[in-house]
């Protein structure tokens, strides 16, 4: 037990030692919250315990992002493909969404966080939908960090949905063919009105996007870590941001 707390103190100290340039903080950070299942397996625990531990990490990272001045934080929580998981795990995940909102929404509201969800919410359980709508309504006028939780989200599904909307507008003669371009497509995505992610972070050692923000991440920087999400700390976030600040973003130029 003593070693655990010593490690925590060491990590906190390391976090404070990482210097962040306040003038170059990413406006939008996207994170693939991966490794909950691995974390649980390493401890001979049910996968659901890994997801629960991951909730604590969300709380810490949201607070750190708010403190650093990040404007948008998008967290990949449940993909369109995750419905293929065992039913008991899916049910537990949906319950955790409701639990997280119930426990955290007052604190988020107090800290001026705007709560938002991206993805096809209509496919989620009714209680989950109600919790989401209530949280969005409560925080909609806040002026701090916008927290996007990606639920029943898939990058390809998002693009297909946006293209269908555009096609319908074209059929209805609301737009002309010449109007269709990157700007119009972006306006028909779940992230409309938000800047694209400056950096996409993925813990757990996996080196892929997993159908996450495919359109929006065209020019994002990527940062990968072998740490599982429940063990991801404020210090790890600062390392990612520090690395981002030392990169030269060219956006296709020289």
Language model: regions and residue ranges:
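Flexible, compositionally biased loop and terminal segments
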Residues: 1-254
């Amino acid at each position: 037990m003593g070693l655990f707390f010593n490690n925590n103190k060491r990590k906190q100290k390391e976090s404070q030692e990482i210097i962040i340039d306040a003038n170059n903080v990413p406006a939008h950070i996207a994170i693939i919250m991966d490794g909950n299942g691995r974390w649980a397996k390493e401890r001979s625990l049910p996968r659901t315990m890994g997801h629960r531990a991951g909730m604590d990490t969300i709380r810490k990272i949201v607070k750190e992002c708010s403190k650093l001045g990040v404007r948008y934080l998008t967290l990949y929580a449940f993909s369109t493909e995750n419905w293929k998981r065992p039913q008991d795990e899916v049910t537990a995940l949906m319950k955790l969404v409701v639990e997280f909102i119930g426990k955290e929404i007052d604190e988020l509201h107090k800290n001026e966080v705007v709560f938002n969800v991206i993805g096809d919410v209509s496919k989620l359980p009714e209680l989950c939908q109600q919790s989401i709508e209530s949280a969005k309504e409560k925080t909609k006028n806040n002026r701090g960090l916008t927290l996007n939780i990606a639920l029943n989200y898939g990058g390809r599904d998002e693009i297909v949905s946006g293209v269908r909307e555009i096609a319908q507008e074209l059929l209805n003669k609301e737009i002309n063919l010449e109007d269709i371009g990157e700007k119009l497509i972006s306006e028909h995505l779940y992230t409309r009105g938000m800047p694209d992610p400056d950096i996409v972070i993925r813990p757990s050692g996996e080196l892929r996007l997993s159908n996450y923000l495919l359109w929006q991440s065209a020019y994002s920087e990527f940062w990968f870590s072998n740490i599982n999400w429940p063990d991801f700390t404020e210090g790890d976030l600062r390392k990612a941001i520090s690395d981002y600040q030392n990169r030269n973003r060219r956006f296709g130029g020289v």
